[in-house]
Regions:
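Metalloprotease/metallohydrolase-associated module, dominated by Zn2+-dependent proteases
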Residues: 1-47, 63-100
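Active-site recognition of the HExxH zinc-binding catalytic motif
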Residues: 50-62
């Protein structure tokens, strides 16, 4: 499956694109002002999926007005890892939760 070019979050359309301007410690970045999620190409497929979800959670955090920067990164990192693990191990639950 190819990387999507955009994601809608609470009615806000964020572009998803690769960036070569990341520093060595960054795998992704969410630019709230320009509504762009930047991802580093320097990561494997599973890491890329994890990073995309991580940056989406940053956008959700921002759009919901949760402005506590002191805990945002830790919360986002732990939530991403836990949520993606549950989703991978329980596809039937994901299908049920997303059902309409």
């Amino acid at each position: 499956m190819n990387l999507p070019s955009e994601v809608e979050i609470f009615g806000h359309c964020y572009q998803i694109c690769f960036s070569s301007e990341m520093n060595d410690e960054e795998l992704g970045r969410c630019d709230q002002t320009r509504q762009i999620i930047f991802l580093s190409k320097e990561q494997g497929a599973d890491s890329l999926r994890d990073t995309l979800l991580h940056e989406i959670i940053h956008a959700v955090h921002w759009l919901m007005g949760l402005n506590d920067k002191s805990t945002e990164e830790e919360f986002t990192a732990r939530t991403t890892t836990g949520l993606r693990s549950v989703m991978l191990q329980n596809p039937e639950v994901v299908e049920y939760v997303l059902g309409r």
